[in-house]
Amino acid sequence: MYSGNKVVISWIVSIGFVGMPEFMSSKTFALCRQRSFLHGPAGIRSDEEKENNFFGRVSFMDAALLLEYGWVLLVLIGLEGILAADNALVMAVMVKHLPEEKRKKALFYGLAGAFVLRFGSLFAISFLVNVWQVQAIGAIYLLYISASHLLKRYVFKKEDTHKETKQSGFWPTVLKVELADIAFAVDSILAAVALAVTLPGTSLPKIGGLDGGQFLVILAGGIIGLVIMRFAASMFVKLLKERPSLETAAFVIVGWVGVKLALYTLAHRDIAVVSEHFIHSGTWKLIFWGVLAAIAVCGWFMSGGKKQPEGAQNEQKNSTRERA
């Protein structure tokens, strides 16, 4: 009964189309009549339904893509913020021996260099990722900075003050800061690329060997990281004055970042000493960030407050006795 009614309705609709050719083109009229004859009235609406379903799927895919990109961007902002804070801490340590005016200038040059180098490295992503020598130089320099400071402080205690006076010039300090910026820029861009390449591709043109959407995520994360560095550098200079022993923890962190860069270098496909799978695994990320957090926490609690000179302590004791 239902199929008979369907055929009747189909014929009625098809007959009705005979009186409607002036409102549509002959091609559209023929198509509608054919579909009404074969599939009934539902066939007329099938194109519209398919179109709605298609746009529904597209909008869902767009929303999912935006959510995925947004989540990775948030993670990248946090990561770049931590690396920028490390970079700012190293700059603060390197310039703290300078007079106030020169210290501000050295910090300005260091921040300007960090801006230029990180933006430059964005457009040389393919070069930085494929050439392991660049990664190796950055790793060696960070390890050298860390080892040099720790050896001077805890092994060659007598030579430490003499060498510091020799290396307290303004421009040598700026040069050291810029070299550290290069190493941190390489580490930052490698970390950003490792996150961004996990994102699905977009229709945007490629930039620097990367998909346009992935590149924009790295760019946004890098800019926010630089803004964090701008404000963190001055804060760390003040913090190091209050907690001088925190400087040792800062150099241990520098060495640990150097170890990370060294492992990235050894995992390069041209060397392949370390498994590339291990470098990108959750186990290594957990180890790296866990050790980094442990160094920071231990350094904070072990540094304590700034010790007062003996003269100041005696004056404070005398004043308390007089009050008593």
Curated annotation (Swiss-Prot):
Topology of this chain in the membrane: Multi-pass membrane protein
Transmembrane segments: 4-24, 63-83, 106-128, 132-151, 179-199, 209-229, 246-266, 282-302
Main subcellular location of this protein, as a coarse class: membrane
Entries under InterPro entries matching the protein: CHP03716_TM_YkoY, Integral_membrane_TerC, MFS_trans_sf
Record's keyword terms, sorted: Cell membrane, Membrane, Transmembrane, Transmembrane helix
Record's GO cellular component terms: plasma membrane
One Pfam family here: TerC
Subcellular location(s) per record: Cell membrane
SUPFAM superfamilies: MFS general substrate transporter
Keyword Transmembrane: yes
Keyword Ribosomal protein on entry: no
Family: Belongs to the TerC family.
Name of the protein this chain belongs to: Uncharacterized membrane protein YkoY
